[in-house]
């Protein structure tokens, strides 16, 4: 039986689900950029790409060389293709304007070019997260500068989302709003090949992912929930749980997507003015879309993440996502 490449899958989606051709082309361009990033990541010290740039991004985080390189790869791959009205990235303060010499399209691309990059130097899996939105009609004027407001849409408006994970294999996880598919990069063929069909997150779990070193800074509902997990079979939940924490959202969520579990990045009392650590537009929204499409759930503790109306491009949010039963339990604790 012939293998299904990403290109073939997208063509079949156009035929069976009326996926627009320009969206198909956009996903293929993003996938090609991810292959290039994967190649750069795999070289490590041999490619001279480890270490920091000595600069900070808009969040005040030190930029790694690969952060900047990955950002440039995604911008250059997508700016000329004619599918996008604009782009936004974790590494840029403001939206990226499509150069006037290129045609513009109907979509917006938002991305974290290299999630988990603080782990690069220690050879831990990292990845690229992306979200695709439709550009509102009022912002489609070819001559106008695209404003940030065009991007400020709730996650429910996403038309596609995905992430590439650069680990022992390079994989692309993708949703077009009708389930989640997983593609593995065949390095000899040079193509992403469908290897995981109709991915589903188990409703209950025996694993959780959270940075326990911050426990003293959590809100009471999170402390209560984690204490119940740690109580094991003798506790109120009646079973033993294992904890996993990689400190790379892509890697942690990928494990939960394929094995089940709950990922938590709660608010922190050390920064009470911030509603969370992770960014809504290009981390929480695409991951929540993927998790929900796989049968899981995602909230900020009190509200479904995909229902949140963004107020700014780099807005932060608390995140609880994964197996539906566990996410509903901790969300219930927040509402008590």
Curated annotation (Swiss-Prot):
Keywords: Carbohydrate metabolism, Cytoplasm, Hydrolase, Magnesium, Metal-binding. It is found in: Cytoplasm. Mg(2+) 2 binds at residues 112, 115, 283. Its cofactor is Mg(2+). Its EC number is 3.1.3.11. Gene3D superfamilies: 3.40.190.80, Fructose-1,6-Bisphosphatase, subunit A, domain 1 (3.30.540.10). GO terms for cellular component: cytosol. It holds the Pfam family FBPase. The keyword Cytoplasm applies. InterPro entries: FBPase_C_dom, FBPase_class-1, FBPase_N, FBPtase. One of its GO terms (biological process) is gluconeogenesis. It catalyses: beta-D-fructose 1,6-bisphosphate + H2O = beta-D-fructose 6-phosphate + phosphate. It is an enzyme of class 3 (hydrolase). Mg(2+) 1 binds at residues 90, 112, 114. GO terms for molecular function: fructose 1,6-bisphosphate 1-phosphatase activity; magnesium ion binding. Pathway: Carbohydrate biosynthesis; gluconeogenesis. Substrate binds at residues 115-118, 211, 277. Binds 2 magnesium ions per subunit. Belongs to the FBPase class 1 family. Homotetramer. This is Fructose-1,6-bisphosphatase class 1. It comes from Pseudomonas paraeruginosa (strain DSM 24068 / PA7). The lineage of its organism: Bacteria, Pseudomonadati, Pseudomonadota, Gammaproteobacteria, Pseudomonadales. The gene is fbp.
């Amino acid at each position: 039986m012939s293998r299904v490449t990403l290109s073939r899958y997208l063509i079949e989606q156009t035929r069976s689900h009326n996926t627009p051709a320009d969206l198909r082309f956009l996903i293929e361009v993003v996938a090609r950029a991810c292959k290039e990033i994967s190649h750069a990541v795999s070289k490590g010290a041999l490619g001279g790409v480890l270490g920091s740039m000595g600069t900070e991004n808009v969040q005040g985080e030190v930029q790694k060389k690969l952060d900047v390189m990955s950002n440039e790869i995604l911008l250059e791959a997508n700016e000329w293709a004619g599918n996008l009205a604009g782009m936004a990235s974790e590494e840029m303060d403001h939206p990226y304007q499509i150069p006037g010499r290129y045609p513009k399209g109907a979509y917006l691309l938002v991305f974290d070019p290299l999630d988990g990059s603080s782990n690069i130097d220690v050879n831990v899996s990292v990845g690229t997260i992306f979200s695709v939105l439709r550009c509102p009609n009022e912002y489609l004027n070819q001559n106008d500068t695209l404003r940030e407001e065009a991007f400020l849409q709730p996650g429910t408006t996403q038309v596609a989302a995905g992430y590439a994970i650069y680990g022992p294999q390079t994989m692309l996880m993708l949703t077009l709003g009708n389930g989640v598919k997983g593609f593995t990069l065949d390095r000899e063929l040079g193509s992403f090949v469908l290897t995981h069909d109709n991915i589903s997150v188990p409703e209950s779990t025996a694993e959780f992912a959270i940075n326990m070193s911050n426990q003293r800074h959590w809100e009471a509902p999170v402390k209560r929930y984690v204490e119940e997990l740690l109580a094991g079979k003798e506790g109120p939940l009646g079973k033993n749980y294992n904890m996993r924490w990689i400190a790379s959202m892509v890697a942690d969520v990928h494990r939960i997507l394929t094995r089940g579990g709950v990922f938590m990045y709660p608010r922190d009392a050390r920064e009470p003015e911030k509603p969370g650590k992770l960014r809504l537009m290009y981390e929480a929204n695409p991951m929540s879309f993927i998790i929900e499409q796989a049968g899981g759930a995602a909230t900020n503790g009190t509200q479904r993440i995909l229902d949140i109306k963004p107020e700014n491009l780099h807005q932060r949010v608390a995140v609880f996502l994964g197996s539906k039963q566990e996410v509903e339990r901790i969300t219930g604790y927040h509402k008590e």
